[in-house]
């Protein structure tokens, strides 16, 4: 998008906003003009971003984002310490916690193995994971069902199984409200594999 007709600070704001995931130049322009018309919203947003950058860090145990180290999940007295769920990103922890079903601990990899993008095991938090397995009896792989997610889960399972740790994978299949007609073959196959008695 051509920002030549905009004052430089506005053009910089639009450019900065358009670098955010899912925000194209037109949406960035709309957001920029909104922020200019709502100075208090803009100030609050700027302060929140600066505060998050200053105060949020990775938990030294699970690598999730937190403002306390170790994080409240890792220090939670009611958490099942023999059960560890491995996820790709911090937002995955939030998704799992919303279900109120998982009572164990987490480990955030901050990505997946992706040779095409130059991401190998050493770029992930795998070494920290291997250092915190004492007492863990089961590891639940909760990676996304992508080629990279599957490769990462397979890599980790090969590391963990020789340690005598049970390695499981979350079930994949049709979403609630999904329609078989529109599902791809892999999704249907996974749904069949993950079937259970009712």
From Swiss-Prot:
- From the UniProt record, list the coiled-coil ranges: none
A Gene Ontology annotation in the biological process aspect, one of them, is: DNA repair
MF terms (GO), sorted A to Z? DNA binding; zinc ion binding
Family annotation (Gene3D superfamilies): 3.30.60.80, 3.40.1360.10, 6.10.250.240, RecR Domain 1
Zinc finger residue ranges, C4-type: 59-74
Origin superkingdom: Bacteria
Q: Which SUPFAM superfamilies match?
A: Recombination protein RecR (SSF111304)
Keyword check for Mitochondrion, yes or no.
no
Q: CDD domains per the record? A: TOPRIM_recR
Q: Which InterPro entries match?
A: DNA_Rcmb_RecR, Rcmb_RecR, Rcmb_RecR_Znf, TOPRIM_dom, TOPRIM_RecR
Q: Which residues form the Toprim domain?
A: 82-175
Q: What does the UniProt keyword field contain?
A: DNA damage, DNA recombination, DNA repair, Metal-binding, Zinc, Zinc-finger
Q: Which SMART domains match?
A: TOPRIM
**What PANTHER family does UniProt report for this protein, alphabetically?**
RECOMBINATION PROTEIN RECR
> Which function does this protein serve?
May play a role in DNA repair. It seems to be involved in an RecBC-independent recombinational process of DNA repair. It may act with RecF and RecO.
Family that this chain belongs to: Belongs to the RecR family.
Indicate what this protein is called per its UniProt record.
Recombination protein RecR
Taxonomic lineage of the native organism? Bacteria, Bacillati, Bacillota, Clostridia, Eubacteriales
What's the gene? recR
